[in-house]
Design a protein with these regions (language model features):
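A contiguous strand-loop segment
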Residues: 25-133, 154-306
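Histidine-centered catalytic/metal-binding microenvironments
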Residues: 454-545
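Second-shell loop/turn segments in exported
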Residues: 124-128, 136-145
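Glycine-rich, aromatic-lined ligand/substrate-binding cores of catalytic
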Residues: 240-385, 389
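Positively charged n-region of N-terminal signal peptides that target proteins for export
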Residues: 1-7
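Bacterial N-terminal signal peptides
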Residues: 9-19
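Substrate-recognition/cap regions that form aromatic- and gly/pro-loop-enriched pockets
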Residues: 338-472
Length: 545
């Protein structure tokens, strides 16, 4: 009995530790009538040490009786000590679709796109007898589903049958017509596959076509209308589990996030600051309170139609121009860096143990981000485009990758995270981001100029390329596929080359405290206010305290 209890406690702790490690991501979803071009949009920032390597995993036909392995640690495959672990297998389906694999998969050939964020949840939902982590569900959903609704149903049914072992998770799942928010948590420690009960608790809500929504590490689904099957989906135990736990009883208002995530993770404004910023930028007329005690309404209408570039800007945001501006104040150092490294509890002052830095949407430890754009007026291989960026958003550059792309350059699917690799595109972006922190205020202008030049080119050429590729697709789908793959590969290869060139240009231009050009050597020095704050000119033997 004691041994069993020790195993149970250890398993629970490990599950919570894995969930806690992923509590960092941000996603925004936008309905098709709220966008500038009628597309469905989604954005996602993968904010932690996750697999940055982008790979195209081909679909195919499968024989009856084939089995699919189920793994843990899929998302961690560049992190030491996180080996891929097989925990089971399930029957394969007759046909699977090609999908785009990265730490948390983002798109399939059927133009379904997907973002993610973790929300932790309650200990009462943790389960060690289940097998599915969220990224494995994403893989299977994208391999097997042709629409957002279909993908959600597939993931929900698989989790119910085989059990969900991860912490509370959310996925923003879109296609050419609609986009949904899917949230899932575990069935509790007593669940077993033989119990006959669902192995997960989940719910999904459809984003109104004229609205958008934002999520950042806390459950966001509010009241569920159980009679509205067009706009809500849920597991059969979503009410009964809460009732069995004593959290809810029939006749009371059923608010999913209050029942399954009543105490969100982290410092008080870890999630809220990002949510407020997104709504503040896209719907400034609403004037949401900066420090609201309650959650903001999930859905809002934007003040103006949203374009992919708006979501890119949102991903890159560091609260500039607000009283929380990450580039201002002593914490930004003399050169205005928005980077705030993690602070362990023992490092914090005694009266600040429960506090932390402000949290912006762009984060230095981001592995990759993307903006998904799905249209209903283009053939399937062109309908969805993932504007993909390696490393932190504020210093990345987004390159378009179409759903019909068959391969991507090797530099995008390689790179050891513990060893600098000049053959890895991720390292080009990570290097630029880290070098910029030496003097962010000076270097960010060079970086933004290159972002504007390259992304401007990609957007300017988008319509013409899509028109030509769509015309070719009508005549010869195979040649159109080759055209798409070459176009994407050429862009990605050029971006890799140009970003390494930018990296070495920054090294030469900004070093030893100077801005160096062919005919000037300009000392950058320090801001006057910062010099005063640190006691510049004092003749004391000891540094100013």
């Amino acid at each position: 009995m004691r041994s069993s209890m020790r195993i149970f406690v250890l398993g629970t702790v490990l599950c919570l530790a894995m969930a806690g490690a992923a509590l960092a991501c941000t996603s925004v979803m936008v309905g098709k009538k709220a966008t500038a071009d009628g597309s469905v949009l989604v954005s996602y920032t993968c904010d932690g040490w996750y697999d940055h390597r982008l790979k195209v995993i081909p679909g195919g036909s499968h024989k009856k009786g084939e089995m699919v392995p189920v793994y843990h640690n899929i998302c961690y495959q560049t992190r030491p000590g996180k080996e891929l672990k097989k925990v089971g297998e399930i029957p394969q389906v007759e046909k699977t679709y090609t999908y785009f694999h990265v730490g948390y998969p983002i798109m399939n050939e059927k133009s379904v796109v997907m973002g993610e964020y973790t929300w932790g949840g309650r200990e009462e939902n943790e389960c060690q007898n289940a097998i599915f982590m969220i990224e494995q569900l994403q893989v299977l959903g994208l391999q097997r589903g042709a629409t957002a609704r279909e993908v959600i149903k597939i993931m929900g049914e698989l989790a119910e049958k085989y059990g969900y072992a991860d912490g509370g998770e959310a996925l923003t799942v879109g296609d050419k017509d609609e986009i949904w928010l899917f949230e899932i948590t575990g069935p509790g420690p007593l669940w077993t596959p033989e119990s006959g009960k669902p192995g997960a608790v989940w719910a999904a809500v459809r984003c109104p076509d004229d609205s958008y929504a934002m999520g950042s590490n806390r459950s966001r689904i509010a009241e569920i209308d159980f009679d509205d099957k067009d706009n809500y989906m849920y597991s059969p135990n979503v009410k009964s589990f809460a009732e069995e736990q004593g959290w809810w009883k029939e006749g009371e208002l059923f608010v999913f996030h209050k029942l399954y995530n009543p105490e969100p993770y982290g410092s008080p404004y870890y999630q809220q600051r990002r949510e407020w910023r997104a709504y503040n930028l896209l719907s400034p007329s609403v004037k949401l309170a900066e420090d609201a005690a309650e959650q903001y309404p999930l859905f809002q209408k934007p003040d103006k139609p949203v374009a992919p570039q708006d979501l890119m800007a949102l991903c890159r945001d560091v609260l500039e121009g607000t009283r929380f501006d990450m580039t201002k104040g002593m914490a930004a150092g003399p050169f205005g860096t928005p980077t705030r490294y993690a602070v362990t509890k023992d490092m914090k002052p005694e009266d600040r143990k429960g506090n932390d830095w402000n949290r912006s949407i762009s984060l230095f430890r981001c592995s990759y981000s993307f903006v998904g754009q799905v249209r209903d007026n283009l053939p399937e291989p062109l309908a969805a485009v993932a504007w993909f960026g390696e490393d932190q958003p504020i210093t990345t550059c987004y390159v378009p990758i179409y759903a019909g792309t068959k391969t991507v350059p090797e530099s995008y699917n390689t790179g050891d995270r513990i060893k600098f690799d000049p053959k890895s595109t991720w390292w080009a972006f990570n290097f630029v981001g880290n070098w910029a922190d030496l003097n962010f205020a000076a270097m960010i202008g060079d970086i933004r100029a290159e972002q504007k030049r390259l992304e401007g080119k990609f957007f300017a050429e988008q319509a013409d390329f899509e028109k030509k590729a769509a015309e070719l697709y009508k005549k010869d789908p195979k040649k159109a596929s080759e055209m798409i793959t070459k176009h994407v590969g050429d862009y990605m290869t050029q971006l890799d080359k140009d970003w390494w060139a930018l990296a070495w240009n920054l090294v030469g231009k900004y070093n030893d405290g100077y801005r160096i050009t062919s005919d000037t050597l300009e000392p950058l020095g320090y801001p006057t206010d910062w010099l005063k704050a640190v006691g510049f000119g004092d003749h004391d033997a000891e540094p100013k305290k």
